[in-house]
Amino acid sequence: MRSFLLILFCVSLLTGCQGERVDAAKAVETQPKTQLNVGTLYGAQIYVTTGQGLAGFDYEMAERFAKHQGLTLNMQPYPTISDLYQAMRNGEIDLIAAGLADTQSRREQFRLGPPLYYVNQVLVYKQGAKYPTDVSQLDDNITVISDSSFIETLAEMQKLYPELVWDQQWDKDSEELLAMIARDEISYTIADSTTFEINRRYMPELRAGPVLREGQAVVWLLPPNGSDQLMSDLLSFWHQEKRAGTLAHLNEKYFAHVKRFDYVDTRAFLRAIDSRLPKYRDNFVEYAGDLDWRKLAATAYQESHWNPNARSPTGVRGMMMLTLPTAKQMGIDNRLDPEQSIRGGAKYLSDILNRLPESIPENQRMWFALASYNIGYGHVEDARKLAQSMGLNPSAWRDLKKVLPLLQKRKYYKQTRYGYARGSEAVHYVDNIRRYYDTLVWIDNQNQQLQDEVMEAQQQTAEKQSQSEISAAQPN
């Protein structure tokens, strides 16, 4: 009898513990979700750290999606696509937002969200090499990233060209492979069109060969199971943002201005960053105020190529190419003095920004201000009124850049208060400054990364030296 009671007591203890574990598991399951965990890759158009914080098409969309769900965003960059896949399988992330294209292989492994934008796959080689007209008869292998959409494209092409071969890199990303092309370390790679267009501003030696696949949708990846509600929320969010013009705005912000490319100008700008910018950088930083100093520096390069003695037949002079009336208004005595010119240009640009209507979003105000700096505030206001009369959004840069060139046509400028203006030049002016700015941000990031690597190496060396000294001091 005593043994029976002892067994019954032990069973009741075990049952009670099991019940506590079940209740604890239920509590975890029912605990309200507070953050959206998103996996990503580093990339200028995906996720990047700038002096003004985080940026990137996927980052901005993920931030909006988290807000749409009432969650905070936890966006974690992973080293490779393979690592992203594994993190998804391990349940570490809710979705992947990393500029990845829609492929059959990914459809078989994950659920794919709606299209964010479209890209082409292009074969990339270095300037000076023969244009690769026939992919099946290249003089060297193609090097691509493992688990990328390019593998699927090459596998399909290999069915037609059995002799086609390629190398896979497991520890590199697209930007690293493009840099290897520029350094003559590899002969060919494949990149999506947006990545190529963005990176050739920093590596102007890159050249685009034939398009291997056209119009691939870039999508987000969701878990294959248990993601019905997340997919429903994502589709609702996508329709909302598309109607609001967010997708069009982000496409314009990250991709529109990089399509135009001038090899000679890009090379000259990169040289000027080394030879001229260091002389004036402190002035740009000092007088930028609330502006990003790199936008001010990019504007100065567009105006004068950082030449303090620049002159124009129209009467503008100096680093920031100020008119005499504007210089007087800004309190500038000598337009050819670089410090005064930068101070005056910064103040003038700041004044324009303050004049702009509040309806213009913060992230687009600079483009409106730069257009005004170029052709005058009144002409930009004329273009905004024209945009409104045409059913376009007068406070969206993507719409205003369509209307500005119309100020050169009599049919339109006769309707305006200030008349004719070279609006197409204003569009090119702003696009150029945006490209120069992006390049300055990229170079700053590269320099910071190099400094971090040097500091890490020094720290490791110091730790090894300290351990050696401790070992040497210990008695045998």
UniProtKB/Swiss-Prot annotation:
Residues 1-15 form the signal peptide. Its EC number is 4.2.2.n1. Residues 16-258 are annotated as: Non-LT domain. SUPFAM superfamilies: Lysozyme-like (SSF53955), Periplasmic binding protein-like II (SSF53850). The keyword Cell wall biogenesis/degradation applies. CDD domains: MLTF-like, PBP2_YfhD_N. Keywords: Cell outer membrane, Cell wall biogenesis/degradation, Lyase, Membrane, Signal. The active site is at E303. One of its GO terms (cellular component) is cell outer membrane. Pfam families: SBP_bac_3 (PF00497), SLT (PF01464). Its main location: membrane. It catalyses: Exolytic cleavage of the (1->4)-beta-glycosidic linkage between N-acetylmuramic acid (MurNAc) and N-acetylglucosamine (GlcNAc) residues in peptidoglycan, from either the reducing or the non-reducing ends of the peptidoglycan chains, with concomitant formation of a 1,6-anhydrobond in the MurNAc residue. The keyword Lipoprotein does not apply. GO terms for molecular function: peptidoglycan lytic transglycosylase activity. It is found in: Cell outer membrane. It is an enzyme of class 4 (lyase). In the N-terminal section; belongs to the bacterial solute-binding protein 3 family. This is Membrane-bound lytic murein transglycosylase F. It comes from Shewanella loihica (strain ATCC BAA-1088 / PV-4).
